[in-house]
């Protein structure tokens, strides 16, 4: 059972926000949806999917140290003494926990969406905002109807900032997640031909991304890619509910304007202007796409009124993320190969960015540049 100084959920409060009931009193220090990784003291949520049923793993989760399990039914194999939170539906219950976590939080919340660059921007925000206070952010790419409420359910009450990644597969999804997370700042990294599966064209994607403004808090801020063809459409949607729009990019009227980008592996130099004030900084992650993401980060920092000079000092050590353009040196016989690993995921936009990065690379001894590509499935 969780100790009192680490408790994030009591059984009574969880029952109150979910409309459920508890079999026995319990205290939990977090929320988990995976019995294989549940940590001691966490509440295990028995989600049900097309190919799995978390109720089959309740005993495994409790044996691993879970403080309790949230269930919609009690399997015969579960002991009567087991600490449970019984709810009508565990997916709905998880969303209710997310809403409860958000309601008691004092954090300034940043919602991040976009066709590409969401996770990288979220990680840079996690890093830079930590210079100004405690930060809670989405794990990996937990950005859907499960990941967003899970992020909010695990939001510590004392966090100063929360960074919530918000993705989508269909229209209406971002609106619901925005209303759940209620961001103070909404970031749209870009709009492009990615995740087209349930959309007829990119215009529909732009409209879906604009749903992030639906749940924005009063006095909120929108941070938008000024160079994107859909900037005006997004700005019009944002201005219905936000107080300020911050544009980033190369455009002359961008609030956060990129003046110059000098690429050098592991130490890229950016010269920018923030409302006309010059700022020079280094960025460890390689590629112009990472540079653009860093401009969005500066837009958030500027919107919060924090010191951008302090923030950019964090970016020099940011080397990107595993599978997203990280460089590896591999010894091969008498020579050496530099591998740029961009294998995490792919869409036409991210593939172009990867090829552009490869194209600007300068192999030693006039070596060749080789692209190894797979299907986009």
Regions found by a protein language model. Name each.
Residues 84-86, 109, 134-137, 245-247, ...:
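Conserved beta-strand scaffold positions in the cores of enzyme catalytic domains, especially
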Residues 94-97, 125, 129, 151-152, ...:
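Buried hydrophobic packing segments
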Residues 75-80, 187-338, 360, 366-367:
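Acidic, Mg2+-coordinating active-site environments of NTP-dependent enzymes
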Residues 49-52, 321, 343-377:
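Active-site beta-alpha connecting loops in nucleotide-dependent enzymes
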Residues 1-96, 100, 368, 377:
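N-terminal leader/targeting and accessory segments in enzymes
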Residues 41, 164, 224, 340-341, ...:
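Active-site flanking residues adjacent to catalytic metal/cofactor-binding acidic residues
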Residues 13, 93-226, 230-243:
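Phosphate-binding loop of NTP-binding sites
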